[in-house]
């Protein structure tokens, strides 16, 4: 009887098992369908453009597909507002919005791979808003959208003396050419905020803002006054400082007491006022001459400090060269769009994109980069990379264990210590946020020094021997040199990136010798190259 009860319980469980089995089959089918889905990728974050400059709108398909026969449309706010329309064999301008005519530049270098770019020239404040791009064919339609923010930094503020007002002197600060509406502040010599007497901000036909604001400075209150104007979208501000001697500030109380007397002796009062005015203008002239002299002294001091820092950076670069290492590139890690030379020193972009063997754990599938064969887990190592005249690149070092099957943020938190160039002149690092780098001389060759035990990775401009930037971190694994030539370089035949051959030296300390050419900043040997360097 007990066996019969067990058999009945087994029969009750059969429908439940079948339900789980069919649910599992349906999940596998849905996963297989979604795995082949293609979508459109645009900028991941809002784009900030400056007034009068150009801005780039990149757009691509999530997988390599030929988009040459597709309709590609950039639009504003809605699809019907056409910014640019690509339709084989060439873009059509009849549907283009009037404000964008003769201001767009279409790049189709990688259209066979599903990647295109649109440049909008001479950005205006009215260009601010939401944009998008759409790919359209007989069997596919997809789009991506993003925000464009526009910012304009106006002219340097100017403070003018408007005259005496009540119990003090009235100053006026003016500036123009700002977007969006700027913020303005008056501050005293101790940094305290001063309440403005008046403030007027106007907007011209081009959408740019001009401002005029005034403040009254009273006797004994401030030895100097500054006018500060800041753009809310840019991390910079413009400031003008004027110094006022207390003797020039009117004191109304004694004047009020003497008012009756001046009415009686009006001619004498006029003489006294004339003498005071002459004294005021004489003091003002002396003050201006003193300000000019002080400005020249400050400039000389800053130039001396700059020269000292430059010589200090060159000494650090010279010391780094004694740790020169023979670094070569590993073709097994290179992205399929890159080609590594036979000697392992040069990497360049190739036209065709070969297929990648499935499950290859060494090769990068998304990042167009390549790693070195050498692995560094101790000691100091120095190498140099010739970047030529490329307008975009990244280089540095990364952990050997970084993920290679998808995109990555090139910051120390993800295992990357690199610097980069964007749009020919924007040098920066991610530490962890974007940090802009100011370089006096555009580098054609970058030196990299890795001090593993000290947790330090430094970059040098070999063109003038100056120090650029240093990461300080704690390394937790083997590091490899990292090179990433950007595919969208902006030139038809961009220069390759090359790891330079350096004389490998022992650990001995180099002596200072200004006549040792090997230690001097890098100078090109090709006369034609040298001429181009001078022109640039």
From Swiss-Prot:
The keyword Cell membrane does not apply. It comes from Mus musculus (Mouse). Its main location: membrane. This is Butyrophilin-like protein 9. Keywords: Disulfide bond, Glycoprotein, Immunoglobulin domain, Membrane, Repeat, Signal, Transmembrane, Transmembrane helix. Disulfide bonds join 59-133, 173-227. Coiled coil: none annotated. Belongs to the immunoglobulin superfamily. BTN/MOG family. It is found in: Membrane. Residues 36-257 are extracellular. Glycans are attached at residues 102, 139, 224. It is a single-pass type I membrane protein.
């Amino acid at each position: 009887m007990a066996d019969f009860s067990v058999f009945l319980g087994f029969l009750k469980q059969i429908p439940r098992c079948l339900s789980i089995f069919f649910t599992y089959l349906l999940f596998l089918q849905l996963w297989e369908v979604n795995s082949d889905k293609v979508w459109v990728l645009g900028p991941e974050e809002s784009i900030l453009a400056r007034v009068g400059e150009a801005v780039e709108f990149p757009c691509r398909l999530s997988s390599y597909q030929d988009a040459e026969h597709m309709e590609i449309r950039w639009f504003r706010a809605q699809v019907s507002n056409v910014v640019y329309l690509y339709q084989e064999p060439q873009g059509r301008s009849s549907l283009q919005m009037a404000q964008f005519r003769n201001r767009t530049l279409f790049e189709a270098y990688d259209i066979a791979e599903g990647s295109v770019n649109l440049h909008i020239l001479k950005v205006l404040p009215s260009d601010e808003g939401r944009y998008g791009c759409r790919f359209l064919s007989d069997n596919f339609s997809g789009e991506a959208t993003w925000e464009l923010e526009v910012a304009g930094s106006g002219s340097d503020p100017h403070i003018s003396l408007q005259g005496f007002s009540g119990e003090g002197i009235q100053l006026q600060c003016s500036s123009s050419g700002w977007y969006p509406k700027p913020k303005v502040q008056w501050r005293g010599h101790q940094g305290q905020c001063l309440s403005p007497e008046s403030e007027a901000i106007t907007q011209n036909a081009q959408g740019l803002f001009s401002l005029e604001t005034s403040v009254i400075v009273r006797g004994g209150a401030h030895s100097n006054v500054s006018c500060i104007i800041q753009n809310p979208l840019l991390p910079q501000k413009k400031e003008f400082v004027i110094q006022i001697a207390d003797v020039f500030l009117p004191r109304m109380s004694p004047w009020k007491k003497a008012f009756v007397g001046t009415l009686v002796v009006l001619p004498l009062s006029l003489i006294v006022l004339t003498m005071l005015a002459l004294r005021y203008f004489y003091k003002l002239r002396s003050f201006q001459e003193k300000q000019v002299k002080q400005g020249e002294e400050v400039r000389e001091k800053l130039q001396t400090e700059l020269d000292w820092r430059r010589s200090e950076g060159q000494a650090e670069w010279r010391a780094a060269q004694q740790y020169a290492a023979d670094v070569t590139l590993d073709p097994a890690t290179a992205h399929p769009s890159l080609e590594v030379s036979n000697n392992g020193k040069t990497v360049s972009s190739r036209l065709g994109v070969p297929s990648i063997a499935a499950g290859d754990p060494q090769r990068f599938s998304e990042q167009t980069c390549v790693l070195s064969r050498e692995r560094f887990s101790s000691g100091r190592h120095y190498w140099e990379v010739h970047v030529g005249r490329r307008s975009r690149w990244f280089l540095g070092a990364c952990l050997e264990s970084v993920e290679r099957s998808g995109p990555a943020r090139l910051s120390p938190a993800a295992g990357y210590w690199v610097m980069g160039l964007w749009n020919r002149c924007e040098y920066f690092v991610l530490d962890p946020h974007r940090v802009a780098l100011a370089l006096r001389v555009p580098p054609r060759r970058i030196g990299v020094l890795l001090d593993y035990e000290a947790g330090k990775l430094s970059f040098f401009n070999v063109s003038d021997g100056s120090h650029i930037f240093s990461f300080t971190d704690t390394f937790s694994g083997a590091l490899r040199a990292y090179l990433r030539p950007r595919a969208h370089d902006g030139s038809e035949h961009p220069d390759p990136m090359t790891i330079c051959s350096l004389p490998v030296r022992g650990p001995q300390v180099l002596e200072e010798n200004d006549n040792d050419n090997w230690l001097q900043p890098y100078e090109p040997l090709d006369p034609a190259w040298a001429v181009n360097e001078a022109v640039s």
